[in-house]
Curated annotation (Swiss-Prot):
It comes from Borreliella burgdorferi (strain ATCC 35210 / DSM 4680 / CIP 102532 / B31) (Borrelia burgdorferi). The gene is lgt. The chain crosses the membrane at residues 15-35, 57-77, 106-126, 242-262, 289-309. The lineage of its organism: Bacteria, Pseudomonadati, Spirochaetota, Spirochaetia, Spirochaetales. It is found in: Cell inner membrane. It is a multi-pass membrane protein. Catalyzes the transfer of the diacylglyceryl group from phosphatidylglycerol to the sulfhydryl group of the N-terminal cysteine of a prolipoprotein, the first step in the formation of mature lipoproteins. HAMAP family: Lgt. This is Phosphatidylglycerol--prolipoprotein diacylglyceryl transferase.
Length: 328
């Protein structure tokens, strides 16, 4: 009996085949809409005095920053073809170098985090200077982390629809059509294929093996699990503004770091730190570290620094208010 699952033949990157609207693009539109509505809902629920027009300017800068940061990280860090360095306009255009429409493909969330902070910071110190958006910026970062995590899984579902970002070989896994096939001469490949019910003829040089659906596992832990922790736990123990955002960044980085062990390293990058070269299908080392894990460790440290800094800001406000009350 076969011990694997075939990738659904009816699932394609396009919502409707022949029409250039992809699940990936649709997922981002839905995430933006969910975040927009959910942040505004929290603002109103907590009676935070922010004008709708100021909020919309803030959200525009946040979304723009997240997209720019995500695209820059994806194209300049993860892509090693050099095409984006020689044709930088392709970073922001939905076309390939031959001007064929491709849609926007590739976003790195680590860069998205950075852009989603830098762009609003610029905006609140220029267009929104001396507004309540500037006053409540740290509170808005908390709202944003809760809102974004609530819709995050949609992006990973789109990755699954693209049959990309799949995991490592596993019995009972899914055979992704776009997965890189294995050389049948690699030690352990023939034995593994036989163990899951895949036949290899003497003339087969390559074979596609079942893999962990790591994009779905990532989506579950970095999306719903993280959202529930933020909403039902950390929101209740929050003592100052900015705390939840810092916790969110650390939670995301924590889950991402460990789930990366299940994920196939990026083909062009491989392992950035290789303690033990992989020479057979069964070999594995916790000390082989991918780019995603390095960036996640950096992100985790950034989240911790954010929590420390925002705590100091909160303590300073309390001290100033106490001194002011004492003087009065």
């Amino acid at each position: 009996m076969p011990n694997y699952i075939n990738y659904p033949s009816w699932l394609h990157p396009e919502v409707i085949q022949g029409i250039p609207i992809t699940w990936y693009s649709l997922s981002y539109i839905l995430i933006i809409l969910i975040s927009y509505k959910f942040i505004w809902y929290q603002i109103q629920s907590d009676n935070v005095d922010i004008k709708k027009e100021d909020y919309e300017i803030f959200m525009f800068s946040l979304v723009l920053g997240a997209i720019l940061g995500g695209r820059l990280a994806s194209t300049l860090v993860y892509d090693k073809s050099g095409i984006y360095y020689s044709n930088p306009w392709l970073i922001l255009l939905p076309f390939d170098q031959h001007w064929n429409f491709t849609g926007f493909r590739g976003m790195a969330i680590h860069g998205g985090f950075l852009g989603a902070i830098i762009a609003p910071l610029i905006t609140i110190n220029t267009n929104l200077k001396n507004t309540n958006v500037q006053k409540y910026f740290l509170k808005l970062t908390d709202y944003g982390s809760i809102a974004f995590s609530s819709g995050y899984i949609l992006g990973r579902l789109a990755n699954f629809a693209n049959a990309e970002l799949y995991g490592r070989v596993m019995k009972g896994g899914i055979i992704f059509p776009n997965a890189e096939p294995f050389d049948t001469n690699i030690p352990g490949v023939k034995e593994f294929a036989s163990s899951v019910g895949l036949e290899i003829s003497p003339h087969d040089l390559l074979i596609n093996l079942p893999r962990i659906p790591s994009q779905l596992i990532e989506g579950f832990f970095e999306g719903p699990v993280t959202f529930l922790l933020l909403w039902f736990l950390f929101k209740k123990i929050k003592k100052y503004d900015g705390f939840i955002f810092g916790v969110y960044v650390m939670l995301y980085a924590f889950f991402r770091f460990f789930i990366e062990y299940l994920r196939e390293p990026d083909k062009e990058l491989g392992f950035i730190i290789t303690y033990k070269p992989i020479t057979s299908l069964s070999e594995f080392s916790f000390l082989n570290i991918s780019m995603g894990q390095i960036l996640s460790l950096t992100l985790m440290l950034s989240g911790l620094i954010w929590i420390i800094v925002t705590k100091k800001i909160a303590d300073k406000k309390i001290k100033n208010n106490t001194n002011l009350a004492y003087k009065n």
